[in-house]
Amino acid sequence: MAQTLTEFDTIAAISTPIGEGGISIVRMSGEDAVKIANEVFKGADLTKVPTHTIHYGHIVDPDTDKTIDESMVTVLRAPKTFTREDIVEINCHGGIVVTNHILQLLLSHGARMADPGEFTKRAFVNGRIDLTQAESVMDIVRAKTDKARQVAVGQLAGGLLHKIQAMRQEILDTLANVEVNIDYPEYDADTVTAKQMADTAKSVIKKIDRLLKTAQEGKILRNGLATAIVGRPNVGKSSLLNYLTQSDKAIVTDVAGTTRDTLEEYVSVKGVPLELIDTAGIHHTDDKVEKIGVERSKKALDRADLVLLLIDASQELTAEDKALIEETKDKKRIIVLNKSDLGQKITVDEMKKQTGSDVILTSILKEKNLDKLEELINKLFFAGIENSNDQVMVTNQRQTSLLTKAKKELQDVVQAVEDGIPIDIAQIDFTGAWDTLGEITGESAPDELVTQLFSQFCLGK
């Protein structure tokens, strides 16, 4: 990208959530950040203090000489900052009025309101981080479990960046020799055959495949696993939701049909972030309100990554149970045989044989075997991942799509070589794969893509 830090103006934004709190932070970045802060700060002369120091004083409106708040001001000088520009962070008392007043004061003295994600964008443009690291900043903020945080921290440290760079270098080394072979065919000593180019393509494809295998887990860690709790009325769906969330969000009674809409809640189960959806009992009803809930339940079922299908083990299978077993057969699911404390007319072995699914016998009321249910959820989605020391994962659709595209280009290289196509023609896809991998890190990403990516960030980041 063409911009350098000297071409940027000075930006400001509130970096903490708006609302009441102990402390709020107003952040500035840019060439004039220290000068602007010094104009509204009564205390040490900020233009003369050392970098990476914090100073007590008061924020004062120079036009009225009125004190806005007492504060601690941190001065961080380029280039050893997040944006590689001068940064000033004003720590003031939390509260909407005082925080906005300080922000407006900075804007009136020459700063500009930052766009969403602009601080992180400047870190990228100034070479402080790559695009995968930039994405990890928001992943850390949005992490729903400690495992998600660990993966995001690994990305921020450059885990995925280093793997992508290594693949690009492998392609580039071969590509450079291919260019020599094409331009100077008379020098046979350094000739790189088409087979060698195909071998490099195969080597990189294997590395891409290893990353793509983590894409599903990465997506789940980033967005949560959409988990629909389904079953006919009064089989314990709401009780399971309340157990997993340790709350009483759902109404629990012995009256069928008390949940008339879908309830959603995020919860961590053995490190797996679940977006739990407690559905209304899926059954035939003439009640207009219940009908709406049943339709919404069916839509929730359609988008679910995992289905927890609850069946009353103390009763024989009903027509509604059988219909739900059929309706969810193509979903990844766990069948939960509940109410085992009331007797058992359905066995685990019978249900496994009939459905081919994982089956757990429980009593949610007595909290029996619910720990085994949690372990099974973890095993289904994170087998071999949870205890791995390798925290590098593909965590979003952008990364997955580009890796898939690069793999296809490399597969085309291999096919071209096998078909005897001239090396200079096969080289086109080889170069394309190198560029595509560069889009993941931002080394060859178009400006429009970069702008669109950072627009999804929150203000102050």
Swiss-Prot record:
All residue ranges annotated as the TrmE-type G domain in the record: 224-382
Binding, Mg(2+): 238, 259
Assembly and oligomerization: Homodimer. Heterotetramer of two MnmE and two MnmG subunits.
Cofactor remark from the record: Binds 1 potassium ion per subunit.
Entry keyword Hydrolase: yes
EC number: 3.6.-.-
Keyword Hydrolase found: yes
Family per record: Belongs to the TRAFAC class TrmE-Era-EngA-EngB-Septin-like GTPase superfamily. TrmE GTPase family.
Name the UniProt record assigns to this protein: tRNA modification GTPase MnmE
GO biological process, alphabetically ordered: tRNA methylation; tRNA wobble uridine modification
Residues that bind GTP: 234-239, 253-259, 278-281
Alphabetized InterPro entries for the sequence: G_TrmE, GTP-bd, GTP-bd_TrmE_N, GTPase_MnmE, MnmE_dom2, MnmE_helical, P-loop_NTPase, Small_GTP-bd
Main location: cytoplasm
TM ranges: none
Organism in which the protein naturally occurs: Lactobacillus helveticus (strain DPC 4571)
Function statement: Exhibits a very high intrinsic GTPase hydrolysis rate. Involved in the addition of a carboxymethylaminomethyl (cmnm) group at the wobble position (U34) of certain tRNAs, forming tRNA-cmnm(5)s(2)U34.
Entry's Gene Ontology molecular function annotations: GTP binding; GTPase activity; metal ion binding
Binding sites annotated in the UniProt record for (6S)-5-formyl-5,6,7,8-tetrahydrofolate: 27, 89, 128, 461
GO cellular component terms, semicolon-separated: cytosol
